[in-house]
């Protein structure tokens, strides 16, 4: 499909720079093909669900994966930034480097020299390989938990580009850009639909008889990469590592068997479920990398509903929601959201989408 089919005008002021307070006070647009759009609040979610429904959350935890450093090559040096996006060994990460042209295989990079202290006072790495598009494989001098400790000391929360271009990250982001149920460290971007949930909302959902279960997909920085191709067939997704436990798989299959609805909280949860699912829609225990890229025409096998934030024009995530609820439906929903001053992107408002039986896109 042509990528420009997923383009729309988004006023810059509609991009949220901070989350709503409290988290569950954010707006939520309910979108069901063929029915009127319904303006609600995230706190209304329990009233829109029924006993026996299942919410599926991504419990990945964001790490401070943005690093500022100095590249040294002999006597020459230059400032560089690295955004880690996939761990491939206890001491090795794939990273997007800026500016990529300043690094080469064999370079030494000294991180943590921007005023922060870190474990042993420094965090050094060697460029093992240089890939395409500014990507590089970094081998750190520290490994395992020692590397993790150093990253927490010197790293910054990797805010999405459209937010980072407006302001620097701060201590507040370390809490704001993390779900309250995050537990499995490894993401460099938050599963942002989950940011809306509070203990009070969980209690209300429990009282309604709505189940919640967890999967893990370590969201990579590739989620922010722009689609540069003119056709979706020419876009390549970066792989992310995920897993579905036996406990969660059994719970989802049991819920579907008794007629309960599966509600994916966030596109990351949905992409992982679709990666794991069998043809008949059942979900096995699963783990591994996924680079699934969902566009209109895709046949969904798992979720009946999707809770997700409002995404950017021409993004792979807007393509996914268009596949889920229909391109025309989502075009109308986003026009309504912009006209009614919904807040977009990672810190923005939410939508609750019903799956279209057949894409109108």
Swiss-Prot record:
InterPro entries noted in UniProt: QueA, QueA_dom1, QueA_dom2, QueA_sf
Keywords of the record: Cytoplasm, Queuosine biosynthesis, S-adenosyl-L-methionine, Transferase
Enzyme class per UniProt: transferase
GO MF annotation, one: S-adenosylmethionine:tRNA ribosyltransferase-isomerase activity
EC number: 2.4.99.17
A GO cellular-component term linked to this record: cytoplasm
Signal sequence extent: none
Pathway in which this enzyme or protein is active: tRNA modification; tRNA-queuosine biosynthesis
Annotated GO biological process: queuosine biosynthetic process; tRNA wobble guanine modification
Cellular compartment(s): Cytoplasm
Catalytic activity: 7-aminomethyl-7-carbaguanosine(34) in tRNA + S-adenosyl-L-methionine = epoxyqueuosine(34) in tRNA + adenine + L-methionine + 2 H(+)
Function: Transfers and isomerizes the ribose moiety from AdoMet to the 7-aminomethyl group of 7-deazaguanine (preQ1-tRNA) to give epoxyqueuosine (oQ-tRNA).
Family: Belongs to the QueA family.
Subunit structure, as described in the record: Monomer.
Protein's UniProt name: S-adenosylmethionine:tRNA ribosyltransferase-isomerase
Gene behind this protein: queA
